[in-house]
Amino acid sequence: MGRAFEYRRAAKEKRWDKMSKVFPKLAKAITLAAKDGGSEPDTNAKLRTAILNAKAQNMPKDNIDAAIKRASSKEGNLSEITYEGKANFGVLIIMECMTDNPTRTIANLKSYFNKTQGASIVPNGSLEFMFNRKSVFECLKNEVENLKLSLEDLEFALIDYGLEELEEVEDKIIIRGDYNSFKLLNEGFESLKLPILKASLQRIATTPIELNDEQMELTEKLLDRIEDDDDVVALYTNIE
C-alpha cells in the first residue's frame, strides 16, 4: 500500500481504543510466536519482534506476559491463515489472520465482502503473485546518530544481512529486505546494538493503483470492517 493510504490508516489507528482493537492483535502475535518457538525471547527472534512491536504500542508488561503464558494453554491453540479478496475499482486485498476458529473467521470476512457490492472473497493463491513479500524494519534516525553512524554506514553495515533498500522518512529510517531475510536483518540490528522501533513482514503490491477520493471513501468502508475484526492481524491492498 502506498504512503497516502498508510497515512490515512495511521490516522485511523490513533482513533482506535487500543485496549479493544490493537492490544488483542498484538497479544495473538506474541502467543503464536511463543507457541512456535518457545517462551524465551532470547532464543526466539519471532517472539522478540512481537514483544518489541507490542512495547512500541505501549502494551503493558502484564498483558505481554499473559500472552506468552497463553501459548501453553488451550487458549493458545491459534493458527495463521491468509485470505484473499477483490473489491471495486480494481482493488486487491490480502488478509492475514490468527484465529482459534477458522470457520468463524471466514464467515465473518465473507459477511463484510457480501455487504459491499462488487466485492468477493477469491480462492487463496489467486492474488499472491500480485504482491512481493518483504521484511520491513523501522528505527529512529537519532538512534543511528547516537551510534555515530551515517546513513551510508548503516546501509553498508546491513547489506550483508539482507538489506535491499533504505529510506529516510521524517525522523525514521525504514529498511527493506527479502521476506526470507527477516531473521538475518534482525540479527544485523542486534549486532549494531541499534534499537528496532518496529519490524514486520509485509506484502507490497507489484502494480499499485490510485483511487480518487470518492472511490477511496467507498473502499475504506470495507477495509475498516476487515481491520476491525480481531482475527485480522494484517491487511494489504494494491492501493497506492
Curated annotation (Swiss-Prot):
GO biological process annotation, one example: regulation of DNA-templated transcription
Source organism, top-level taxon: Bacteria
Pfam families per the UniProt record, alphabetical: TACO1_YebC_N, Transcrip_reg
Cellular localisation: Cytoplasm
Keyword annotations from UniProtKB, A to Z: Cytoplasm, DNA-binding, Transcription, Transcription regulation
GO cellular component annotations of the record: cytosol
MF GO annotations: DNA binding
Gene3D superfamilies linked to this entry: 1.10.10.200, 3.30.70.980
Principal subcellular localization: cytoplasm
Similarity field: Belongs to the TACO1 family.
Name listed for the protein in its UniProt record: Probable transcriptional regulatory protein HP_0162
Source organism: Helicobacter pylori (strain ATCC 700392 / 26695) (Campylobacter pylori)
